[in-house]
Amino acid sequence: MGDIAAAGFSAVQTSPINECLEGEDGGMDLYGNGKWYYHYQPTDFKIGNYQLGTRDEFKAMCDEAHKYGVKVIVDVIANHTTPATDEVSEDLIEAGGGILNPLSQGGRTPLNDFGDRLACTTYEMGGLPDINTERPSFQKYFFNYINDCIACGADGFRYDTAKHIGLSDDPKR
């Protein structure tokens, strides 16, 4: 972190630190089964995954960054889960309304019209099951994750696929 601060940078952004799909062979091979985009396929909203480390390691990194005046921005995904739905935690499934329920009002319908706000916020994007972000139980579950990130030292967030996150005043079916 000292080198980052000395180079004039005031912030770093992490990849998503949530639990995510590992793939085969533990997912450690970035060019094989442990692809970078697995970080964007949450299996739960708890800190820690097989490539970026544990909650304690994240906290230690934040503490080190703050020693040098470097802020930590965390990339977060609130919109969807992994398509490997059998890997998604029961807690997340329950908070999101259930995969077979489905997770969102659009079900497993593929998104084809990116200009349609209802479709953008309720349909699957790229085969990734949409989460019903309008659901209060999911909001509470997700904010518990965000608050844990803050408790560990996160200073800010970048929301991936922000335009696909449904809001309470969005159109309904």
Name these PLM-found stretches.
Residues M1-G2, A6-C152, H164, D169-R173:
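Substrate-binding/active-site clefts of carbohydrate-active enzymes
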Residues D155:
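Receiver (REC) domain switch/active-site residues of two-component response regulators
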